[in-house]
Amino acid sequence: MGCAPGGPCCGPCGPCCGPCCGPCCGPCCGPCCGPCGPCCGPCGPRCGPCGPCGPCCGTMEKRNGLQRCCPF
């Protein structure tokens, strides 16, 4: 999928641009964290296995000693 300024972005803002999770488009999202998971950009830190949850990314839970992001 192509990527253009102001287009779809990653994480809760919209689908990822590019193959897998390539660069994000649009003002609502920052850089993707590649195959690790979606990102939040200005909303907060990256979600998914790459990093902690931000306010727009749902909640953090601990399971079996590992933290992970949960959907809203």
Curated annotation (Swiss-Prot):
Tissues expressing this chain: Testis.
Entry-linked Pfam families: MSSP
Top-level taxon: Eukaryota
Keyword terms, alphabetized: Developmental protein, Differentiation, Repeat, Spermatogenesis
Record organism: Drosophila melanogaster
A GO BP entry: spermatogenesis
Domains (record comment): This protein is mostly composed of repetitive C-G-P motifs.
UniProt family annotation: Belongs to the MST(3)CGP family.
Family matches, as InterPro entries: MSSP (IPR005634)
Protein name: Male-specific sperm protein Mst84Dd
Gene: Mst84Dd
